[in-house]
Curated annotation (Swiss-Prot):
Protein name per its UniProtKB record: Diaminopimelate epimerase
Pathway: Amino-acid biosynthesis; L-lysine biosynthesis via DAP pathway; DL-2,6-diaminopimelate from LL-2,6-diaminopimelate: step 1/1
Active-site feature positions: 73, 224
Site (Could be important to modulate the pK values of the two catalytic cysteine residues): 166, 215
Positions annotated to bind substrate: 11, 64, 74-75, 164, 197, 215-216, 225-226
Protein family membership: Belongs to the diaminopimelate epimerase family.
Oligomer status and interactors: Homodimer.
Gene for this chain: dapF
Disulfide bonds: none
């Protein structure tokens, strides 16, 4: 199986070109776990398939390093857009990508050599009702700074879906974020039927925030694009910034520029990089 390893701000995945590779559906979860293993596999946060689509030039399927399939991945979207453009699957610089969470619009920014350094993705409108997250409780109600007890401590949660669920908590100092302690407890909390990505945010100013994440199905990662989008939406909902404002989000792996537009869409701009290409031969039944 030919693969390309790529990363967006250190959030790395093994990318498989399914225009050329034929994989068995029933083996995909186990394959994702195997290739993501840093000791016995290639090493990554998961596996992303770049597939043909009836609705768009390309389709993205995301598998976490535990084998579960995710609806969306912001960092993955940027890398898929870069791959699709550089490999000639699209000619335009703006095009749709199909995800399990719906269609998203990607715009690549090629350099003079025709290679893509950065990508802007229109992540669409955030979903804020409990039923859309999903989160148990009154279906239509928004969850903004809602008291929520985790362990023996009370936090204030803001819940946002960017095609996948996020629970955001604001803290005074990002270095004190209890990611390893609170992340796994909240990730699989019964209040979130589909589990949830857990984010901690420190607001520096209306144009700058710090961000840490415990990703659903992956644990601590260097970056989470949809999480950064959700964090900016949550910052607006809590009055720390405003719609239409570009916000720099500092993640462990680097920076993203996010804005929640007046029309409701969320734009994300950031880097996408290719690390290496190779052939994976272990454990395949074909």
């Amino acid at each position: 199986m030919k693969f390309t390893k790529m990363h967006g701000l250190g959030n790395s995945y093994i990318y498989v070109d399914c225009f050329k590779e034929l994989l068995k559906e029933e083996e995909l979860p186990a394959l994702a776990v195997a290739v993501a293993d840093k000791n016995k596999g290639i090493g990554s946060d998961g596996m992303i398939l770049i597939c043909p689509s009836d609705r768009a030039p390309v389709k993205m399927r995301v598998f976490n390093n535990d084998g579960s399939e995710a609806k969306n991945c912001g960092n993955g979207l940027r890398c898929v857009a870069k791959f699709a453009f550089e490999h000639g699957y699209v000619k335009e610089t703006s095009f749709d990508v199909e995800t399990l969470g719906g269609l998203v619009k990607a715009t690549v920014h090629p350099n003079d050599n025709g290679l893509v350094d950065t990508v802007t993705v229109n992540m669409g409108e955030p979903r804020l009702g409990r039923a859309q997250i999903p989160m148990l409780g009154e279906e239509a109600a928004e969850v903004v700074a809602e008291p929520f007890t985790i362990g023996e401590k009370e936090y204030r949660l803001t819940a946002v879906s960017m095609g996948n669920p996020h629970a955001i908590m604001f803290i005074d100092t990002i270095e004190d974020a209890p990611v390893e302690q609170v992340g796994p407890l909240l990730e699989k909390h019964e209040a979130f039927p589909d589990w949830v990505n857990v984010e901690f945010v420190q607001v520096v100013s209306p144009t700058e925030i710090h961000f840490r994440v415990w990703e659903r199905g992956s644990g601590i990662t260097q970056a989470c694009g949809t999480g950064a989008c959700a964090a900016v939406v949550a910052s607006v909902l809590n009055g720390f910034t405003q719609k239409g404002q570009e916000v720099t989000v500092h993640l462990l792996g680097g920076d993203l520029t996010i804005s929640w537009l007046e029309n409701g869409d969320v734009l994300m701009t950031g880097a996408a990089e290719t690390i290496c290409e190779g052939t994976y031969v272990k454990g395949l039944s074909y």
